[in-house]
């Protein structure tokens, strides 16, 4: 156990639960319902546009309410398709609410960290009920003492307000005694680091060339390519 660290904040999407797998499944079914032909390469467009929108949310340029109206309108436009983007967003969220595909070794590492007596907290951007239901469906919710989701916190990662909302639940715990673990360099790593937390970047893609995005490894305190590597840190 790392005696310096007391509280672990773990991102959900593409850290504990495979958002990409769930989103591709949901997109396929959404297209089927809308009478559109889905091809796997279309998911690449969804990922690109979805990531751009979330980046703007993280920068404070868009809100979660904006996401509801613009995500599928934008994706459909880039695919050259016509459909009701708002209705597709509703169906996509309904399906995503049901999606709970664990990232490899996620449950094992949660069990390990729980036995090490760390205080485990989920820290995620997104709709509260959706994220809680997905953790519950994956049998992961039981490991967390707190679940901080942006919709309920009232602020998004990487804002200081989000981390303020988390830390107010802990009396006598310093940011330096906390670690933020996640796949996003902006929301998780930059957000945690700016708040004074230790950080661990999980490269969900497993692409070791991704370290080049991390300023030669100088942004995050730790970089891992598999969740099991946390055992070498904590």
Report residues per predicted region.
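Catalytic-core regions built around general acid/base machinery
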Residues: 105-117
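Asp-based, Mg2+/Mn2+-dependent phosphohydrolase catalytic module
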Residues: 1-8, 21, 83, 111-114, ...
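N-terminal helical cap/lid subdomain that shapes the substrate entry/recognition surface
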Residues: 2-104
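Short glycine/serine/threonine/alanine-rich loop segments
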Residues: 36, 118, 197
């Amino acid at each position: 156990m790392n005696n310096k660290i007391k509280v672990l904040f773990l991102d959900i999407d593409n850290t504990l639960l495979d958002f990409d797998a769930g989103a591709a499944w949901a997109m396929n079914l959404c297209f089927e319902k809308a009478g559109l032909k889905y091809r796997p390469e279309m998911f690449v467009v969804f990922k690109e546009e979805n990531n751009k929108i979330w980046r703007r949310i993280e920068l404070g340029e868009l809100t979660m309410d904006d996401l509801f109206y613009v995500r599928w309108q934008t994706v459909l436009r880039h695919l050259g398709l016509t459909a009701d983007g708002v209705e597709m967003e509703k169906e996509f969220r309904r399906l995503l609410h049901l999606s709970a595909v664990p990232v490899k070794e996620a449950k094992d590492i949660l069990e390990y960290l729980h036995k090490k007596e760390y205080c485990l907290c989920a820290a995620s951007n997104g709709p509260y009920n959706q994220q809680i239901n997905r953790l519950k469906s994956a049998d992961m919710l039981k490991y967390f003492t707190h679940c901080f989701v942006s919709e309920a916190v009232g602020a998004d990662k990487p804002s200081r307000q989000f981390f303020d909302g988390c830390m107010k639940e802990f009396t006598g715990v310093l940011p330096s005694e906390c670690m933020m673990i996640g796949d996003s360099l902006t929301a998780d790593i930059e957000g945690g680091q700016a708040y004074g937390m230790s950080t661990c970047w999980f490269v969900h893609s497993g692409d070791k060339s991704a370290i080049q995005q991390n300023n030669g490894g100088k942004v995050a305190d730790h970089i891992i390519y598999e969740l099991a590597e946390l055992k070498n840190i904590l």
